[in-house]
């Protein structure tokens, strides 16, 4: 990709924003080296990877990338035998922990059913080095100091140091508290000079304490003396400190050697977490600019829906639909300057660059983008003073370079093509240049203010005109792109709005040819038609989305209904079988007891009476099972079924009409607005004459369950009551009830208020009111359902 193209399309500014979302210098380094790819498979994988990270952010809010630093140079130094400092080792341990934590985070999400195949592959490359991590953290504290517990020897040495320091301080403090101390000392303190304990002695008393002078004050009046009585103690302390330093170095070398052994694994883990930091930075950036994953195709067309420029505030910019490559390969945007043509041009270019870099782009869902091997852009005034080039010459140098390199795998962006010279010659050059790049199969977007190019889009099959809408009422551009409508100057309308007289404007119109006037009028009508068509499309699209949403909701309710029904059937069957088993055991017990009584001659009971009693008890058991079980699947209907027959679908308890037979055992059935496949064993033929369909109250829970027309909540706790209201309204809607009543009582009014607050937000509620005098008054709410 040409560096000039990246510069004029402000690709580096996008990277600067992306840098703000990295968690470490590792991720920042990846962003700095980011360039668009031209490999189709790589781009698709990068987009899928960013999408998985975006899914993690949607579900979890963030990713645990804290504590990770760039430890690569430290690890490489360890490999060649250089001793690492405590802080360097601590950075390695923290990064090992961060990589292990990230691996566990992704694996936990996968274990919980979240599909993250690409991220799972990434974290699978992370090798846990828990033992090495713990060795380092057991030896080095959070502040970067080697702790006493790093070795028994170090603990012993530090005990000696603390003991020696305590003895020295005790002796010196006794000296400072003596009766003569106030006279001989400048201050009653114990301090340190040259790593040895000293006291501040006045110059004239230096011989009283003996020992060694280590320092003096700026005035020379105070000497910092190590008294003779503690010289040996200070010497012992220094020896212990030397031993401490040697032991610390031994521990650091030992840890460094262990890092060196695992260096290749550590470096591999670092590369993985660097990529993860980079991936999640792209996902966070997508969230920031409200971007989505585009569909990447290899067929050289793009369909950007509601595209926005990522560097412009999304609350300010006007999104546009931009299509290129299917019905036309070139878009020529005409119209006056300051209308937003250049922004549109840059939006196309930066969206392509971002997509080919694995970044999501600021467009609506289902947008498509293709892969270009080269992107050329001639945008802005980049004339060179040193080369003494004019604006026109500067553009032409760039255009010559583009014409030498552009091919069918190129996207070419021209801003104000042919500008900077005589309008007639400039327009002619613009047409020839466009013809040249179009003939090479390149995809082209060009802006121009030359009116001669308006006809260009009508005379070439693969070229279409476009313009940026201008509001003559506000005298400002709306920045709305109108594809298929060439731009017009609007000079007469603007002049009239600003107060120029009709007489002057009419005279001006007379100076323009009739054909030009006709073209301007035609363009105005095209603009109006475009607006109307777009408005109609938006309304139709809104209805389509609403219908899809309703369809999904109905499917969800049916699935929930089936699951709940099956659960109840299983529960009822289990309870029935338990009751049967209990009855059998009780019967056996009774019979056994009767036999024992007879043997004891305490009762006159015959065998045939015992057998008869047992048979009655056993006969009751199948009946109980029969009552508990509900046969969902009946035998196939005996009636020969044909398309158009009315049947009852047993699993739903709903009527439907047969559409067509899809297999030997299955039919396509229309049930209300739903169409589904149903097995013949799951339906009953209804032998009724065809008549005008009437809406009936449906039994939605099977043959033994009916939805009541009222729900009584009196005595319920608030949370339980709300849950019952939610389920009851869903059941009532499935049963097609037009109206139901909810009894909440009068009481304190809290339950009544809670019910009515919930009804206000329920999507299936049309209206609601208090009950009339005969309906329960303020203790009842009557609900009208949609």
UniProtKB/Swiss-Prot annotation:
Domain Smr: 711-786
Enzyme Commission number, as recorded: 3.1.-.-, 3.6.4.-
Gene3D superfamilies listed in its UniProt record: 1.10.1420.10, 3.30.1370.110, P-loop containing nucleotide triphosphate hydrolases
Binding site for ATP: 335-342
One GO-annotated biological process of the protein: mismatch repair
Swiss-Prot/TrEMBL keywords: ATP-binding, DNA-binding, Endonuclease, Hydrolase, Nuclease, Nucleotide-binding, RNA-binding, rRNA-binding
Quaternary structure, from the entry: Homodimer. Binds to stalled ribosomes, contacting rRNA.
Function (record text): Endonuclease that is involved in the suppression of homologous recombination and thus may have a key role in the control of bacterial genetic diversity. Acts as a ribosome collision sensor, splitting the ribosome into its 2 subunits. Detects stalled/collided 70S ribosomes which it binds and splits by an ATP-hydrolysis driven conformational change. Acts upstream of the ribosome quality control system (RQC), a ribosome-associated complex that mediates the extraction of incompletely synthesized nascent chains from stalled ribosomes and their subsequent degradation. Probably generates substrates for RQC.
Family the UniProt entry places it in: Belongs to the DNA mismatch repair MutS family. MutS2 subfamily.
Database matches in NCBIfam families: mutS2
Protein name: Endonuclease MutS2
Source species of the chain: Bacillus cereus (strain ZK / E33L)
Gene: mutS2
């Amino acid at each position: 990709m040409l560096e000039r193209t990246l510069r004029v399309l402000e690709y580096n500014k996008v990277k600067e924003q992306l840098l703000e979302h990295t968690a470490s210098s590792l991720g920042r380094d990846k962003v700095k080296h980011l360039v668009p790819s031209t490999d189709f498979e790589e781009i698709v994988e990068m987009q899928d990877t960013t999408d998985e990270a975006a899914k993690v952010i949607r579900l979890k809010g963030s990713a645990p990338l804290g504590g990770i630093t760039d430890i690569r140079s430290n690890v490489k130094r360890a490999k060649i035998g250089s001793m690492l400092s405590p802080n360097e080792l601590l950075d390695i341990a923290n990064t090992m922990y961060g990589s292990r934590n990230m691996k566990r985070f992704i694996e936990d999400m996968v274990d919980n059913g979240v599909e993250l195949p690409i991220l799972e592959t990434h974290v699978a490359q992370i090798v846990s080095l828990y033992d090495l991590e713990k060795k380092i953290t057991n030896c080095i504290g959070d502040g970067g100091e080697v702790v006493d517990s790093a070795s028994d020897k170090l603990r012993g040495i530090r005990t000696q140091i603390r003991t020696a320091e305590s003895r020295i301080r005790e002796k010196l403090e006794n000296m400072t508290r003596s009766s003569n101390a106030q006279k001989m000392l400048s201050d009653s303190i114990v301090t340190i000079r040259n790593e040895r304990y000293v006291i501040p002695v006045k110059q004239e008393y230096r011989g009283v304490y003996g020992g060694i002078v280590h320092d003096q004050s700026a005035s020379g009046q105070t000497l910092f003396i190590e008294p003779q009585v503690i010289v040996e103690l200070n010497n012992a302390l220094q020896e212990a400190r030397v031993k401490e330093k040697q032991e610390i170095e031994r521990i650091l070398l030992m840890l460094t050697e262990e890092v060196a052994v695992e260096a290749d694994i550590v470096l591999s883990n670092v590369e993985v977490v660097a990529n993860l930091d980079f991936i999640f930075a792209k996902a966070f950036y997508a969230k920031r600019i409200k971007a989505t994953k585009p569909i990447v195709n290899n067929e050289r067309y793009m369909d950007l829906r509601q595209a926005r420029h990522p560097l412009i505030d999304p609350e300010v910019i006007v999104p546009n639909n931009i299509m290129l490559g299917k019905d036309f390969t070139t878009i020529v945007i005409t119209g006056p300057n300051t209308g937003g043509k250049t922004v549109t041009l840059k939006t196309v270019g930066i969206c392509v660059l971002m997509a080919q870099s694995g970044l999501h782009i600021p467009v609506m869902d289902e947008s498509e983008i293709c892969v270009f091997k080269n992107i050329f852009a001639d945008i802005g005034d980049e004339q060179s003073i040193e080369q003494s080039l004019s604006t026109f010459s500067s553009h032409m140098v760039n255009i010559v370079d583009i014409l030498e390199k552009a091919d069918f795998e190129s996207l070419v962006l021209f801003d104000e093509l042919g500008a900077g010279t005589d309008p007639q010659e400039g327009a002619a050059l613009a047409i020839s240049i466009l013809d040249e790049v179009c003939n090479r199969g390149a995809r082209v977007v060009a802006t121009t203010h030359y009116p001669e190019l308006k006809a260009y889009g009508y005379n070439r099959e693969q070229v279409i005109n476009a313009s940026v809408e201008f509001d003559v009422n506000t005298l400002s551009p709306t920045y709305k792109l109108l594809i298929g409508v060439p731009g017009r100057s609007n000079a007469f309308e603007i002049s009239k709005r600003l107060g120029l007289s009709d007489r002057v404007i009419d005279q001006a119109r007379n100076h323009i040819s009739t054909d030009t006037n006709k073209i301007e009028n035609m363009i105005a009508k095209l603009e109006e038609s475009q607006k109307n068509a777009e408005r109609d499309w938006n309304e139709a699209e809104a209805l389509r989305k609403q219908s899809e949403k309703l369809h999904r909701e109905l499917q969800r309710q049916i699935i929930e209904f089936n699951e709940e029904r099956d659960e109840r059937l299983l529960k009822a069957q289990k309870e029935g079988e338990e009751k049967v088993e209990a009855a059998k055991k009780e019967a056996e017990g009774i019979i056994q007891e009767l036999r024992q009584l007879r043997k004891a001659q305490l009762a006159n009971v015959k065998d045939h009476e015992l057998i008869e009693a047992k048979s009655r008890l056993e006969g009751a058991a199948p009946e109980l099972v029969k009552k508990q079980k509900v046969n969902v699947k009946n035998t196939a209907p005996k009636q020969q079924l044909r398309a158009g027959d009315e049947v009852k679908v047993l699993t739903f308890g709903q009527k439907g009409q047969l559409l067509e037979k899809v297999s030997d055992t299955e039919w396509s059935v229309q049930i209300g607005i739903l169409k589904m496949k149903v097995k013949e064993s799951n339906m009953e033929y209804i032998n009724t004459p065809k008549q005008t369909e009437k809406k009936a109250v449906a039994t939605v829970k099977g043959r033994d369950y009916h939805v009541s027309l009222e729900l009584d909540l009196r005595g319920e706790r608030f949370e339980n009551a709300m849950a019952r209201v939610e389920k009851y309204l869903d059941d009532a809607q499935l049963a097609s009830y037009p109206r139901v009543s909810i009894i909440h009582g009068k009481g304190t009014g809290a339950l009544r208020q809670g019910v009515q607050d919930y009804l206000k937000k329920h999507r299936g509620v049309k209206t609601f009111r208090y009950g009339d005098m005969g309906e329960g008054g303020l203790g009842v709410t009557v609900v009208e359902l949609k």
